[in-house]
Amino acid sequence: MNEIETHPFSPYIPENATTLILGSFPGREQTQTEPDNSKWFYGAKRNQFWKIISSVYNTELFCKEDKQQLFKKYGIGITDILLTVRRKNNSNLDDNLEIIEYNDQAIKAILGKSSIKSIFFTSKYVEKHFCRLFPDYKNAEYLPSPSPRYARMTKAEKINYYKSKLPK
């Protein structure tokens, strides 16, 4: 039986946050290695998230601090919907995550104390679980998955879509 994994990152919510990006759970590269303060959300090498964000905002993002500064500048928060999971087949796929505990208390606190106006999900999986947990929250929508496995859109198309939705 695979071990239970706990999310390694706290939500990042700048005081000026009006937008929340909500993912599922970090890949095993983030959770099954030694703790490292330089690691952060979407740290898997193949994941396109930071490449997309870098292109959207026309800036280089070399480290966690660069990413946090960019999100602070544009009022973007980030967290994940799952807090603890067990992986099936040691897989990073959302569908292979057995949910042990949702991150719903942190998300509820974020929505209750901040001025979040928009939530963007990075997968349909996240959207499904968020809508089940927070059925009354309506100002939320799906962004194309930054996973390279999501091949319905090219990276350039994802960049343009994110650019049309995220704060300027």
Regions found by a protein language model. Name each.
Residues 21-22, 143:
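Short hydrophobic beta-strand that contains or immediately precedes a catalytic carboxylate
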Residues 24-25, 121-126:
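Short, well-ordered beta-to-alpha junction loops that form the rim of enzyme active sites
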Residues 51-55, 84, 109, 132, ...:
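Residue-level signal for well-ordered alpha-helical scaffold segments within enzymatic catalytic domains
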Residues 1-16, 27-28, 36, 89-104, ...:
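C-terminal capping/extension of enzyme domains
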Residues 107, 111, 115-119:
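Proline-aspartate-enriched helix->loop->beta-strand connector
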Residues 76, 117, 137-138:
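A structural micro-motif
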